[in-house]
């Protein structure tokens, strides 16, 4: 059955059967309708959608007298002493609650990390408040709705009349940006004459463009874009050919170029522009504290991208650059938060070192060691196996994980049971992987067999997926990677472990995984050895190991879904009805979502720390004003309010039912990943405003490196939101069948 094609007549027939059977049961046992049919995480084909008539076409009408929404946070304009009294530093930021996947030098990620350190030094909590549009940042600051602005604000004389700028965080150039390969691109400022450049009116770029329009580029047209549109989105539209030209700061452009190869920086129109934070002019104490912090922590950072210093130099710069890979074990983005086993260890190491963490993601795995030795990073933390070949190029720390290398086969395919059966087989691996070295050694004793070299940008998880789908017969994986993958899917099994020359490194496995540093970074290596010795098998380490390798994230169906004859879906129906009515949602849809999230267990806590009936992340709950998410009332209020916010983030011109599905997918995987999928859908010629058969297909592509490497938010296990939306859709149809109103 298609994930979008739930058969209503079949559902009604099953319901009648269940009700008939219930007459023979004890009255104390409520009849249980069968759960919705299992959903295979594959995109449905674009076709007329039979579920559309039953899915909400528009928000339900509001109640006659809706309860008042939660009050706005109180405004406050006090200086640092008053802020300390309140205990929270309120930071105004631009745009979404999710940043790019921080690959290298992301401005938002840098600012967030610095401000968290500043707040900690001042004994404060930090709260990031999103402005609805860029031109609202300064008014919100002056009104007391935040204490400072951290939004890549350029220092200009006009702005300095309204607000006080801190010391500059960075100095940038403003570059004209075009679509790579487009015809007749301008190559110097004079060639902007008669051209159209799209920017926000409140942006400092407008001043630079007006100066050109009045001089060497007469006839230049400055076309405004909505203030709620972020610069990255404008650059993306230019790279797609939807807009001709725009302008971006050099540091942001560098970050965008890391994943969007269709962007071309043409020439600067302004240089030496200062970027700073901003506070109210009547808050000199806060400004002084920020200036002192910036001098200490920002001005001592590295001056170039290449740096090969040891531990003392890293501490002086205040930043540890960690080379890693974007995949579902090492480092990834989920619901706007950064996760990954190697990432957690690297972050803890940076904290112990007393520096800020910066993530650097090379385009392919075989570049990790070259980039390290070139000085583009300080440490590799990417599940890198210790091998003699690699040890000739880098120095490894004490291992932080021990694994076996196992031959992986399809559970329902041809089976191998021993090394003797390798002869004549095809095994697919990357040439740069430790698996390749292991197989080469086995060729001498158990060959011949064919080693098929796969592209270097292909992660092991992608090869496991190809084995499960029957596209390739065998691959090799570390045992912990296979275990993690099996928590998501069936169809994969380990044939047998592959022997490695020499004695086992540990009773836990024959291969060690460790940090890698440059050979001359002896002090850094010593620090990491001590860090691993202290951390290994400790409380935090064991928690991360369980989270990423041992915790099954598949949704269990062991608990039978029940709906009582009285028409009750759950013990919390009245709460669902109350808040759904307040926020214009169908309570049965919210009940279906709550079941999907928690099986109606308000005390449930997920592997990433989400809590309550709607599994709201604590950070999201705090932003919405909720702290007791395990309370059914507060947890439901937070979940339904957040769903309404997600629905409203999508363009109002999109039919409500499609915005609902996008919101559900965003709730599960993150708004940013859904926007990435919509971009891919548009590029593929699919409908970016429709979920089933269109954006859901694009969502699955975010598991493939040729797509997620170019995605703003990076890798996403797209099968999860595809399954999530379809199962809630099907459950909602069942609930509507049972409770028509």
Q: Which sequence ranges carry the predicted segments?
A:
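Extended ligand-binding regions for polar small-molecule ligands
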Residues: 48-74, 81, 109-121, 180-206, ...
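Periplasmic-binding protein-like
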Residues: 95-96, 158, 167-183, 227, ...
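Export/targeting segments at the very N-terminus of extracytoplasmic proteins
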Residues: 315, 551-600, 633-636, 650-654, ...
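A ligand-binding cleft/hinge motif common to bilobed small-molecule-binding domains
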Residues: 135, 150-162, 208-215, 236-271, ...
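Substrate-binding/active-site groove segments that recognize
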Residues: 196, 201, 426, 431, ...
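Extracytoplasmic small-molecule ligand-binding "clamshell" domains
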Residues: 39-40, 46-153, 157-161, 222-236, ...
């Amino acid at each position: 059955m298609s994930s979008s094609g739930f058969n209503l007549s079949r559902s009604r027939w099953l319901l009648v059967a269940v009700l008939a059977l219930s007459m023979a049961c004890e009255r104390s046992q409520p009849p249980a309708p069968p759960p919705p049919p299992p959903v295979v995480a594959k995109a449905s084909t674009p076709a007329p959608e039979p579920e559309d008539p039953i899915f909400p076409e528009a928000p339900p009408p509001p109640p006659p007298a809706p309860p008042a929404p939660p009050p706005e946070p109180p405004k406050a304009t006090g200086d640092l002493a008053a802020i300390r009294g309140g205990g929270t530093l309120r930071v105004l930021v631009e745009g979404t609650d999710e940043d790019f996947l921080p690959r290298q030098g992301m401005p938002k990620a840098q600012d967030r990390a610095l401000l968290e350190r500043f707040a900690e030094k001042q004994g404060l909590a930090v709260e990031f408040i999103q402005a609805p549009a860029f031109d609202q940042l300064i008014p919100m600051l002056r009104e007391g709705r935040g204490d400072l602005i951290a939004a890549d604000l350029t220092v200009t004389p006009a702005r300095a009349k309204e607000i006080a700028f801190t010391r500059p965080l960075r100095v940038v150039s403003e570059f004209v940006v075009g679509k790579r390969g487009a015809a007749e691109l301008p190559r110097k400022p004079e060639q902007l004459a008669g051209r159209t450049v799209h920017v926000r009116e409140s942006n400092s770029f407008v001043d630079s463009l007006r100066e050109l329009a009045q001089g060497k580029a007469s006839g230049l047209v400055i076309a405004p874009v909505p203030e709620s549109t972020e610069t990255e989105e404008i650059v993306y539209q230019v790279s797609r050919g939807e807009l001709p030209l725009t302008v971006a700061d050099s540091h942001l452009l560098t970050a965008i170029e890391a994943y969007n190869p269709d962007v071309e920086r043409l020439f600067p129109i302004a240089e030496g522009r200062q970027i700073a934070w901003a506070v109210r002019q009547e808050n000199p104490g806060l400004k002084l504290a920020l200036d002192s912090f910036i001098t200490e922590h920002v001005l001592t950072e590295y001056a170039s991208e290449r740096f090969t210093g040891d531990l003392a130099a890293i501490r002086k710069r205040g930043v540890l650059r960690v080379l890693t890979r974007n995949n579902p074990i090492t480092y990834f983005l989920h619901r706007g938060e950064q996760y990954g086993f190697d990432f957690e260890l690297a972050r803890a190491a940076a904290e112990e070192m007393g520096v800020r963490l910066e993530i650097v993601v090379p385009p392919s795995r075989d570049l990790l060691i070259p980039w390290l030795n070139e000085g583009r990073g300080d440490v590799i933390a990417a599940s890198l196996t210790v091998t003699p070949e690699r040890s000739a190029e880098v120095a490894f720390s004490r291992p932080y994980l021990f694994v076996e290398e196992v031959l992986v086969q399809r559970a329902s395919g041809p089976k191998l049971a021993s090394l003797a059966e390798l002869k004549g087989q095809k095994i697919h691996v990357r040439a740069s992987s430790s698996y390749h070295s292991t197989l080469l050694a086995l060729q001498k004793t158990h060959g011949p067999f064919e080693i098929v070299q796969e592209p270097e940008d292909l992660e092991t998880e992608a090869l496991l997926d190809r084995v499960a789908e029957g596209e390739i017969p065998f691959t090799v994986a570390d045992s912990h990677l296979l275990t993690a993958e099996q928590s998501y899917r069936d169809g994969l099994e380990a044939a047998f472990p592959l022997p490695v020359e020499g004695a086992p490194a540990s009773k836990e496995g024959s291969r060690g995984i460790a940090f890698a540093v440059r050979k001359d970074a002896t002090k850094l290596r010593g620090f990491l050895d001590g860090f691993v010795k202290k951390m290994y098998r400790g409380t935090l380490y064991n928690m991360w190991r369980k989270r990423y390798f041992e915790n099954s994230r598949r949704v269990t169906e062991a608990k039978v879904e029940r709906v009582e004859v009285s028409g009750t879906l759950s013990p919390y129906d009245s709460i669902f009805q109350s808040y759904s009515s307040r926020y214009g949602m169908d309570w049965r849809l919210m009940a279906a979502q709550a079941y999907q999230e928690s099986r109606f267990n308000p005390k449930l806590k997920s592997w990433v720390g989400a809590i309550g009936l709607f599994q709201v992340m604590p950070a999201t709950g705090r932003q919405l004003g909720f702290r007791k998410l395990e309370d059914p009332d507060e947890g439901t209020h937070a979940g339904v309010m957040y769903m309404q916010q997600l629905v409203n983030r999508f363009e109002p011109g999109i039919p409500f039912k499609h915005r609902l599905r996008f919101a559900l997918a965003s709730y599960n995987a993150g708004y940013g990943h859904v926007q990435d999928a919509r971009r891919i859908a548009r590029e593929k010629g699919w409908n970016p405003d429709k979920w089933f058969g269109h954006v859901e297909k694009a969502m699955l592509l975010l598991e493939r490196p040729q797509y997620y490497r170019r995605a703003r938010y990076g890798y996403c296990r797209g099968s999860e939101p595809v399954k999530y939306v379809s199962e809630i859709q099907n459950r909602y149809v069942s609930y509507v069948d049972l409770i028509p109103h």
